[in-house]
Swiss-Prot record:
Protein source organism: Paracoccus denitrificans (strain Pd 1222)
Protein name per the record: Large ribosomal subunit protein bL21
A Gene Ontology BP annotation from the UniProt entry: translation
GO CC annotation: cytoplasm; ribonucleoprotein complex; ribosome
Gene Ontology MF, one: structural constituent of ribosome
Organism lineage string: Bacteria, Pseudomonadati, Pseudomonadota, Alphaproteobacteria, Rhodobacterales
Ribosomal protein among keywords: yes
SUPFAM superfamilies: L21p-like
Subunit structure: Part of the 50S ribosomal subunit. Contacts protein L20.
One Pfam family it belongs to: Ribosomal_L21p
Keywords of this entry: Ribonucleoprotein, Ribosomal protein, RNA-binding, rRNA-binding
Region (Disordered): 106-140
Amino acid sequence: MFAVLKTGGKQYRVQAGDVLRVEKLNAEAGDKVQFNDVLMIGSAVGAPLVAGAAVQAEVIDTIKADKVITYVKRRRKHSSQRTRGHRQQLTLVRITDLLEKGGDKSGVKPAVGARTKIEPAVKPAKAKKSEAEASAEDAN
């Protein structure tokens, strides 16, 4: 049986035991993660997602992709050349299980990308100054 999952803006066709290179996830090596955005699993096709389906995986390592070099040269300007390189950060995951139902009750943490913002804790409001303290500061 196979599934099609979506993570990092890309879609992957996976089976149990497959090793994938996906966009960087907030997980350490050895952690178990769960992909909840399943577009298709077995013969069930979602519209757009299959309800209750999930793909579980184990994080193997965080790696960097091959370097992509960009070379910029502007005509008619002497010594106006620039070389830049970029290495995309990736996470290696091994698919362990395909769940058609009950993915929301499995207890495994969901796979979250590195750029996803987590809501900050609510900070307590500062105590307001009394009128006497405020007027004392204005006098100084």
